[in-house]
């Protein structure tokens, strides 16, 4: 669906994008993660046709973002981080105005607008003025507006920013529904815990470059691979410890009651073989798993390394 190659953008002396590469497959809900100033909003504005990069290639659905800009705007829905609404319009008028911008009028427009307002839980607000909506309602209204022409790719820049916890949960539920309907979504966000539950893939950007990209399964496999292995022993603990002390993948052992925590440098196959070895030795194992890591910890680890490299580069 989306391919970005060697994308660069400079604002004066500031290099916002420095050779960014990104791949988003059709039907994915892709989380675009990075600290403030990493280049997320600049990237999304280029995708939406609001900025022209200095160099690089961008294709969306096989169309070039430069030469096919007019057609691409019909295939993209864009929800910016700061959005404008027409406060003196009613919700239904607001939706029908944007429908008319895409040539959708009359009964078709009214039907389409009502369907989308139902999808974002605003069907009972059609006759309300936009000015009377809460911030969360306005953000849902802008999401409905971005969907009005049934885009192939939906781009959202910090969509949950400024929302209270309840409203954020409601908004996230709508995005999950769109994902389950097969929509391709590119979501920029700082709320990493929600992205880990919501997304099918993520990309982490730092200083204008992609530092990590992959499916959520791949990302969590990387997170958990360096975490301790936790084993609960029901019986034969001494026999289990003897096996663990002689195992080549075991680096450290910490025992607390029937719980054993291992520094284990092995992959999933090594874990399976160790478990089988314990069972074959008549050790009764009640639980055997890696300690779960978090997207936040991986993000901090990666971006800290990037900051160190940036300092070294500056000093050189």
Write out the residue ranges for each language-model feature.
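Conserved ABC transporter NBD signature motif
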Residues: 56-67, 71-72
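Conserved ABC ATPase "signature" region
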Residues: 96, 100, 107-125
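Conserved ABC ATPase signature
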Residues: 129-133
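Hydrophobic anchor residue at the start of the ABC signature
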Residues: 143
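Conserved catalytic motifs of ABC-family nucleotide-binding domains
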Residues: 150
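Catalytic Walker B motif of ABC-type/P-loop ATPase nucleotide-binding domains
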Residues: 154-157
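ABC transporter nucleotide-binding domain
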Residues: 172-265
């Amino acid at each position: 669906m989306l391919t970005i190659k060697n994308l660069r953008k400079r604002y004066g002396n500031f290099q916002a994008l420095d050779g960014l590469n990104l791949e988003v497959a059709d039907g994915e809900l892709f989380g675009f993660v990075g600290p403030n100033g990493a280049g997320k909003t600049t990237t999304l504005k280029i995708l939406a046709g609001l900025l022209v990069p200095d160099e690089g290639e961008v294709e969306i659905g096989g169309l070039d973002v430069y030469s096919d800009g007019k057609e691409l705007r019909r295939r993209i829905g864009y929800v910016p981080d700061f959005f404008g609404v027409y406060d003196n319009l009613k919700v239904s008028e607001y939706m029908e105005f944007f429908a008319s911008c895409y040539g959708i009028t009359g009964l078709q427009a009214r039907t389409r607008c009502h369907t989308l307002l139902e999808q974002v839980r605003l069907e009972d607000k059609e006759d309300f003025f936009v000015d009377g909506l809460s911030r969360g309602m306005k953000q849902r209204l802008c999401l409905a507006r971005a969907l009005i022409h049934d885009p192939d790719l939906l781009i959202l820049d910090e969509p949950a920013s400024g929302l209270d916890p309840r409203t954020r949960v409601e908004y996230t539920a709508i995005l999950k529904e769109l994902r389950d309907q097969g929509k391709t979504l590119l979501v920029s966000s700082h709320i990493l815990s929600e992205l880990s539950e919501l997304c099918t893939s993520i990309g982490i950007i730092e200083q204008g470059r992609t530092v990590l990209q992959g499916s959520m399964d791949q990302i969590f496999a990387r997170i958990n691979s360096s975490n301790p292995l936790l084993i609960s022993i029901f019986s034969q603990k001494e026999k289990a410890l003897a096996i663990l002390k002689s195992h080549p993948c075991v680096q450290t052992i910490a025992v607390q009651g029937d719980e054993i925590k291992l520094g284990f440098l092995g992959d999933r196959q090594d874990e399976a073989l160790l478990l089988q070895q314990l069972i074959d030795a008549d050790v009764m194992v009640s639980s055997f798993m890696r300690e779960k890591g978090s997207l936040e910890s991986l993000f901090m680890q990666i971006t800290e390394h990037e900051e160190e490299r940036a300092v070294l580069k500056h000093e050189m």
